[in-house]
Amino acid sequence: MSQTASFFPFALLFKRCLLGVFLACAAGPAAWAQTAAAPASGTPGQTPSGHGFVLPKDWTQTRRGDAVVLQAPEGGSWIALVEAEAGDAAQAVAQAWTAYAGRPPPPLRLAVPLANANGWVGGHHFLYRAPAGEPRQLSARALRSGGRWVVRIDDLAAAVAGKRQADLNLIGDSFVPAGHVRESFAGRKAQTLDAGKIEALKTFLERSRRSLEVPGLSIGVIQDGQVVYRGGFGVREHGKRAPVDADTLYLIASNTKSLTTLMLAKLVDEGRLRWDTPVAEALPGFELADADATAKMQIRHLVCACAGLPYRNLDWEFAPANSPASIVFDILARMRPTSAFGASYQYTNPPAAAAGYVGGHVAYPELELGAAYDRAMATRVFEPLRMARTTFDFDRAMRGNFARSHGVGIDGRIALVDPRRDRQMHAVRPTGGAWSNVDDLLAYVSLELNGGRLSDGRRYLPEAALRERWKPQIATGRDAWYGLGLDTDMASGTPMLFHGGRLYGQRSNMVWWPEHGIGVVVLMNSSTGNVLMDAVPRKLMELAFDAQPEADSMVAAAAANERATREARRRDWGAPARRGHAAALAPRYRNELLGELRVERSRGEVRFRFAAWDMPVASRVGAGGAVEFSGAIASPPYPFVAGRSAAGRTLTLRDAQNEYVFTEAP
């Protein structure tokens, strides 16, 4: 996120998407990993031709003819691995669906190329329409090795996919061709990132930025305690001339979590708090919707993505403007675990926001929760690290040198995102509401690389206290785990720590390799830059280790994916909303948790207005004939589905594990 992570689990952040068996946390040379308990690994398996995969714990494996079928513990959700003799990807996928389900593939929504990775080349990803009224994720990946095809089919209930992301990661990244040997940097020394290598990085960045239509990108690279590059590419706002640079402020979204847990680590070192302090002890009155979970919940459980609490964003996204910090605890009081403590990686935002506010309350109990958090972050993090430009104040940030948020409209053009959308983050700011820049975040990455020492050599935090946050709390995939607001990936044989961030129209990532003294911060002002959260660190590894060239393939596949996605949206959606669809809408709807939705019409345009923001909507006919509405720019990740109930007309909004019904109101 997980991405983080980070705010939308359907497109997980950076290397959180790595999949595979989670080996014992003691694997690899990192001493800090050796001290942690190892999450359970899965069971190795093979297809008939010897392509390897790992079956996650509690999943079952069966054969349906030529298909190896893996079933999730909940039942009704499957992954199928099918070898196929075919001339192309589409034929291979058709054969695979027949072998798995005895029928042709479902109606196709989109087909896009896949980047070459893990020994597979020339792959394609097929995305399908789910049946009416059945929230499912249906897709097929046609992968090729040695001229032969193998297909992975995902046939998953949306709720299962939401809570089993780490298991899906485990299956996916462990799935490699027979005889494939994974690339490893273990025991290797990184090369100096000299002027020639930096020039190659800059060329890659500018070419990629243009290919992906990212208006502005800022980056900083550090090696062995020295900043070897800092700068910007492009502009702060599409169509304008003001450039971005290393001082430009971006909304860093979930990267804020890592800064929040640094503040908590400082409080632990001061003796004000323990990671195992019960939350209800630190903040009397704290409660979840489940009494047993409330009693078990410790400070670390709020920031480990390991407490079984599901993704839940819409409560605060649809809240009134300028909602107080206390809204976080109102949301948590409605939440209950959907998996046991420590059983499943579930990346979610309200608990992490609560962690920051609890820390602020412990430090400054006399202040309002939000003010206390802001003060704790200023005194424990921003001031000591000299992060002078980093702020939670949107008004202060959005003056002068800052990057405007951009998305893609239904017409396929880059467009500004309404800033009111991202301002909703202020109420839950410990989980994702900081504005920062390359220079300030390099100071933070330097602290992590220096084991808790500031750039002038002074001790900020004992190394053990700093690295407590690095220790595994829950498996996220192959040799990968989530700690306390930080991800770690050991798949390359050397630890890579990171966290990503994503909000409407903003993307960010910070990554460091502690064994090699290398770190990078990359910030972007467009949703179209997703792949660069992964591809930029990959490019650095190619330059530092002469690694296999994959970064360019990643960007090329992502650019093709973006073009196909835009074309599909133009084809499927009518913007503004089609007249007949709009005419069937009620003037006003209400949901008891998300509040009021008003339908406004002006000059042929239809807008949905909520408590703090509004958006123009497009419409289409979905599966089974239901009319669906979506924001024309920066929509919630799932459409509003029109329907009827005994109470009148309805609009239903579903995320992975939650359903919200807006009902016609007088």
Give each language-model segment a name.
Residues 79-82, 146-159, 509-512, 516-526, ...:
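Short, well-ordered beta-strand elements
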Residues 35, 39, 60-159:
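Conserved polar/disulfide-associated segments of primarily extracytoplasmic proteins
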Residues 105, 173-201, 523-593, 647-666:
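Short, gly/Ser/Thr-rich active-site loops of penicillin-recognizing serine hydrolases
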Residues 66-71, 571-610, 643:
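Short, solvent-exposed loop/hinge segments that bridge or flank secondary-structure elements
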Residues 226, 230-237, 290-504, 508-512:
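Short, surface-exposed loop or secondary-structure junction motifs
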Residues 15-29:
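Bacterial N-terminal signal peptides
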Residues 193-252, 272-274, 281-282, 288, ...:
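Short, conserved catalytic-motif segment at the N-terminal edge
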Residues 82-85, 90-118, 593-639:
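Central antiparallel beta-sheet cores of small beta-barrel/beta-sandwich binding domains
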